[in-house]
């Protein structure tokens, strides 16, 4: 059965009609490093259970909008359908090796891993017939992918008021299979084959959302929650959620980052093959940090690691509007030797946990995630008195 039993389920329509403060959750892409994110989410869930007094309390009971890219899309879809963090973690622990099953030698010219094992597991978890607009989704859900056919980012949500979610539209996005959208968001080029999805009578080729600007989907989620054009089907006075530091909380969870520092690099080493391998990751790293920066510029940062040595963590920063639009917390780990040492994980080899397919490092990734949660996640970040469920 997909989703929670009806008596425990939050009805999305009722949630959208509420005037309570809004809580938004975003999870980065990063392959198997999603396990790190889940340890942070487990601590958040524990604090919410503690405050609510309900052992069966889930992240879907608290968060109104959940966004994810790539592996973050798997986690976000799990949260939106009412899964506990333990249930989502079990998916990774039980299926991690299957998700990264090698292609035959000849097929590795197209992609390193098979798509079928992951697709099959996604069908089992989310249901083959469950669509983006299914009632099993208790929150708004944003999944990020790239439409390779049209050369455009595709941030797609189940917002019933979005332009292409009109049930009268012949290619209504709400009718698309949830498992297939999640699979498309995880179709990392060179790692996995692309996913072909038919929208109405048109087939489109999709790849991982990590190759867009939104591998960290936090600020894009904020825009889709507040900009009126993303709510075009709603009555004018209901197009977008109200902003304010006591009216909106955005929580962003990373999968670990590491700058590709190389102080021994010489100009002669920067040949065609070097640039072909280094530029994509450099662009993704810059885009991920830009999303984080935008959230701190327009939001009141209550938690987050240093962005750089010039602007620091931007806690207490004024910003260009002279007022902040939301409260913001960013939890992430720096997967460098220094960063791991600061988390009490100095014995972990950085190279072993930096790769998105480091199946053998799952235990270390869990340990790192627990260390991040212990150091940085605080009960006051989720104060029920301010951001009531």
What are these regions (language model features)?
Residues 1-15, 21, 238-240, 260:
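Non-catalytic, mobile gating and regulatory segments of ester bond hydrolases
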Residues 24-27, 60-70, 140-146, 205-207, ...:
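Extended hydrophobic secondary-structure segments that form protein cores and membrane-embedded regions
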Residues 48-61, 227-248, 302, 308-315:
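Short mixed-charge
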Residues 116-140, 152-155:
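Active-site periphery "cap/insert" segments of enzyme catalytic domains
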Residues 233, 249-270, 294:
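Extended C-terminal subregions enriched in glycine
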């Amino acid at each position: 059965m997909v989703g929670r039993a009806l008596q425990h389920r939050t009805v999305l329509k009722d949630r959208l009609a509420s005037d309570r403060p809004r809580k938004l959750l975003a999870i980065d892409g990063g392959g198997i490093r999603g396990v790190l994110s889940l340890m942070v989410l487990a601590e958040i869930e524990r604090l919410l259970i503690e405050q609510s007094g309900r052992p069966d309390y889930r992240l879907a009971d608290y968060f109104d909008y959940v966004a994810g890219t790539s592996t973050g899309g798997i986690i976000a879809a799990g949260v939106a359908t009412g899964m506990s963090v333990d249930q989502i973690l079990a998916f990774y622990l039980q299926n991690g090796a299957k998700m990264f099953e090698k292609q035959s030698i000849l097929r590795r010219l197209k992609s390193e891993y098979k798509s079928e094992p992951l697709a099959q597991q996604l069908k089992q978890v989310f249901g083959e017939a469950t669509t983006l607009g299914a009632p099993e989704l208790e929150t708004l859900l944003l999944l990020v992918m790239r439409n390779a056919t049209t050369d455009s980012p595709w941030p797609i949500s189940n917002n019933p008021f979005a332009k292409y979610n009109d049930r009268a539209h012949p290619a209504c996005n709400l009718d698309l299979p949830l498992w297939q959208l999640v699979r498309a968001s995880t179709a990392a080029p060179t790692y996995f084959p692309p996913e072909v999805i038919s929208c109405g009578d048109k087939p489109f080729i999709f790849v991982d959302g990590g190759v867009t600007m939104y591998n960290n989907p936090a600020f894009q989620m904020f825009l889709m929650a507040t900009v009126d054009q993303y709510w075009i089907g709603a009555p004018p006075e209901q197009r977008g959620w109200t902003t304010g530091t006591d009216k909106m909380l955005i929580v962003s969870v990373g999968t670990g980052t590491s700058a590709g520092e190389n102080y021994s690099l010489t100009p002669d080493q920067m040949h065609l093959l070097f640039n072909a391998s280094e530029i994509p990751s450099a662009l993704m790293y810059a885009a991920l940090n830009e999303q984080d920066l935008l959230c701190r510029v327009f939001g009141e940062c209550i938690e987050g690691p240093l962005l750089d040595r010039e602007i620091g963590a931007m806690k207490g920063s004024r910003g260009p509007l002279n007022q902040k639009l939301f409260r913001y917390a960013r939890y992430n780990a720096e997967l460098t030797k220094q960063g791991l040492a600061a988390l009490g994980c100095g014995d972990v080899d950085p190279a072993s946990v930096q790769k998105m397919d480091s199946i053998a490092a799952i235990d270390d990734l869990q340990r790192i995630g627990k260390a991040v949660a212990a150091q940085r996640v605080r009960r006051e970040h989720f104060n029920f008195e301010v951001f009531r469920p």
